[in-house]
Amino acid sequence: MNPFFYFVQLFFYYPFFIIFLYIYLVFFIPKTNNINFSNIFPLFSKWIKK
């Protein structure tokens, strides 16, 4: 199966996966890449809409 479709299925079948992904984006990525909190939502929304 295509990994992208598997990833999409995770969102549909495991709603908590969205919460864990959000926690990951907020807490772990800023520590490694110095991304501002305000930059996370535009990036995340653009990535979902692709």
Curated annotation (Swiss-Prot):
User: What subcellular locations does the record give?
Assistant: Plastid, Chloroplast membrane
Keywords, ordered alphabetically = Chloroplast, Membrane, Plastid, Transmembrane, Transmembrane helix
Q: How does it sit in the membrane?
A: Single-pass membrane protein
Q: Is-annotated flag, keyword Chloroplast?
A: yes
Q: What domain of life is recorded for the organism? A: Eukaryota
Sorted alphabetically, the Gene Ontology cellular component annotations on this record are: chloroplast membrane
Transmembrane portions of the chain? 10-29
Recorded protein name is Uncharacterized 6.4 kDa protein in atpA-psbA intergenic region
In its UniProt entry, the species of origin is given as Marchantia polymorpha
The root-end lineage is:
Eukaryota, Viridiplantae, Streptophyta, Embryophyta, Marchantiophyta
